[in-house]
Regions:
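Solvent-exposed loop/turn segments at secondary-structure junctions
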Residues: 28-29, 37-39, 59, 67-71, ...
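A bilobed periplasmic-binding-protein/Venus flytrap-type ligand-binding module shared by bacterial periplasmic
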Residues: 32-37, 75-79, 159-171
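Ligand-binding pocket segment of bilobal, Venus flytrap-like solute-binding proteins
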Residues: 62-66, 70-74, 78, 82-150
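Extracytoplasmic/periplasmic substrate-recognition and gating elements
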Residues: 138-175
Length: 175
């Protein structure tokens, strides 16, 4: 009764009867960008995944060091489902990422926080929860630039984290 029904409905995609999992948070994957650095580079704020292939951003792009999230960016850029099983679409996405690699400063996970707060990159692919932390930290540090978040118009990954108790857990009562 204390869990938003929308969470329970979302979790039915993998737990149809809501018997084995308890959802606790959800989020998106998007692009965090430094408004000051983009202004200095003469690059408009990103609105599409394709903006991460803009050569003016060479050395200023942080990509997720995650096969799923990196491929999601390339697949969505090309108008495909992030869950594509098509060999041709996956091959095209792979080539897109290979072509993008010279523009990428780093493939990171947690380091995107420090790099974006430190003004070390203009754009970064990031989870929405991390974005909230980064924006709060930027305000508390009194930074002279804004960090903004956008979900590209082609769409994104909407994710849901859930707790489960493994069948072979030793202390199920304590969970």
């Amino acid at each position: 009764d204390q869990i938003d029904p929308a969470y329970m409905e979302m979790s039915q995609a993998f737990d149809p009867e809501n018997k084995y999992s308890v959802p606790y948070c959800w989020g998106t994957v998007g692009i965090l960008y430094n408004t000051k650095l983009l202004d200095e580079l003469g690059v408009p704020a990103p609105t599409k995944w394709a903006d991460l292939w803009d050569e003016r951003l060479s050395g200023e792009i942080l990509m997720q060091d995650s096969v799923r999230d990196a491929f999601m960016v390339a697949l969505k850029k090309d108008g495909y489902s992030m869950n594509s099983e098509s060999k041709d679409e996956l091959e095209q996405a792979k080539q897109e990422l290979i072509d993008q690699k010279p523009l990428v400063q780093a493939y990171v996970i947690d380091q995107v926080r420090d790099k974006m707060i430190g003004g070390e990159a203009a754009v970064g692919v990031i989870y929405s929860g991390e974005m909230l932390y980064i924006q709060d930290e930027a305000v508390s540090l009194g930074l002279d630039y804004d960090l903004e978040y956008v979900i590209p118009e082609e769409g994104t990954n909407l994710w849901l984290d859930s707790w489960v108790i493994p069948k072979n857990a030793k202390n199920k009562e304590n969970a």
